[in-house]
Amino acid sequence: MSMQDPISDMLTRVRNGQAANKVAVKMPSSKLKVAIAALLKAEGYIADFAVEGDIKPELEITLKYFQAKPVIEQIQRVSRPGLRVYKKNDALPSVMGGLGIAVVSTSKGLMSDRAARKAGLGGEIICYVA
């Protein structure tokens, strides 16, 4: 059976891994998943990530905890294959009053909602992380 939405699968694996207090989660790798992981690491939501293997690369995300609680309280897919969500730079959402981020796919690559607003770019809203 083929996977219909690999990004939703990635976010679900991270959510389930943190709910089960796992140290790391593994999943099939893609360029978009690696870009999302890099953004989450830069924003401080995950500890680290690595791509392993040549023929079938796997993405391993090391999860981050603070005082035995997951750093990611909420991770939610917004734009999906059946319903794409696009916003202009002045209409980009602020997640939890600025405490969270919205991952936005712009013409300049993947970035947080704050960075996209600062650059004056809109795009597809991939997910919310808080």
UniProtKB/Swiss-Prot annotation:
GO cellular component labels? ribonucleoprotein complex; ribosome
This chain belongs to the protein called: Small ribosomal subunit protein uS8
Q: Classify the source by domain of life.
A: Bacteria
Q: Which organism is it from?
A: Aliivibrio fischeri (strain ATCC 700601 / ES114) (Vibrio fischeri)
Annotated Pfam families? Ribosomal_S8
What keywords does the record list, in alphabetical order? Ribonucleoprotein, Ribosomal protein, RNA-binding, rRNA-binding
Name of encoding gene: rpsH
- InterPro entries documented for this protein: Ribosomal_uS8, Ribosomal_uS8_CS, Ribosomal_uS8_sf
Subunit note: Part of the 30S ribosomal subunit. Contacts proteins S5 and S12.
Q: Which GO terms describe its molecular function?
A: rRNA binding; structural constituent of ribosome
Q: Which family does it belong to?
A: Belongs to the universal ribosomal protein uS8 family.
Described purpose of this protein according to its UniProt entry: One of the primary rRNA binding proteins, it binds directly to 16S rRNA central domain where it helps coordinate assembly of the platform of the 30S subunit.
Traced from the root, the source organism's taxonomic lineage reads: Bacteria, Pseudomonadati, Pseudomonadota, Gammaproteobacteria, Vibrionales
> What is any one GO biological process for this UniProt entry?
translation
